[in-house]
Amino acid sequence: MQIQDNVFIVTGGASGLGAATARMLVAQGGKVVLADVQAEAGQALAAELNAVFVQCDVTSEADGQAVVAAATALGTLRGLINCAGVAPAMKTVGKDGPHPLELFQRTVNINLIGTFNMARLAADAMSKTAATDSGERGVIINTASVAAFDGQIGQAAYAASKAAVAGMTLPMARDLSRNAIRVMTIAPGIFETPMLMGMPEEVRTALGAMVPFPPRLGKPGEYAQLALAIIENTMLNGETIRLDGAIRMQPK
């Protein structure tokens, strides 16, 4: 799949992994629609990249449809990169009692259902496009986490939501094979996201030192590099790739 002159949607595109991916796509000649709840940051990045910003709650069907409509108005939609998500920390039973059910539901709703919502809507639009010379119509890249495999204390909701994203990768890829649309998932380790960058420097350094090699936090641009490789390599389909420097998370 070539990026040049094609249209790509990036959810969670206003910051972090999504913003790095949007920059990569534009650098490769792609047209980008940024979808995010953060209006101010999203509009600023869209202006910088000459992209389109649509304020979007990924759990909303109407918002998702508006994003896809904006993308198809730009040209031929060829890809969706799902980076929107939340990462709460709460024990199953803590000092204040049981894990709030609303928080668990919200986490699953955004991370899992929001991912599926955007994927199904984008896939429907891509399925109606003419195939490329290689026979491909599009690619969907979802974002899980190493927590899907090595969930830590306090990550029951987050790990469950991300494990489900990894779990639906293969069946979704099989579903969409008849439409010539690929589905891949990236499971990042500890990355320089806005949440982590708000921590004290000594904490960030200690977290980076936990990574076998390279012994540092991952950079958003490295996520974007993998997204680029997935987009360009048509044989990559139906798999979750850990991008984590060989880390295996300890219980806490």
Spell out what each predicted region is.
Residues A87-Q105, D124, K128-S134, G154-A157, ...:
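Conserved mid-core segment of classical short-chain dehydrogenase/reductases
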Residues D124, A173-D175:
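Alpha-helical segment proximal to the catalytic Tyr-Lys
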Residues A39-E40, C56-A66, L101:
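The beta1-alpha1 cofactor-binding region of Rossmann-like NAD(H)/NADP(H)-dependent oxidoreductases
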Residues K219-L243, R248:
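C-terminal substrate-recognition "lid" of short-chain dehydrogenase/reductases
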Residues S145:
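Residue(s) in the substrate-gating loop at a strand-loop-helix junction
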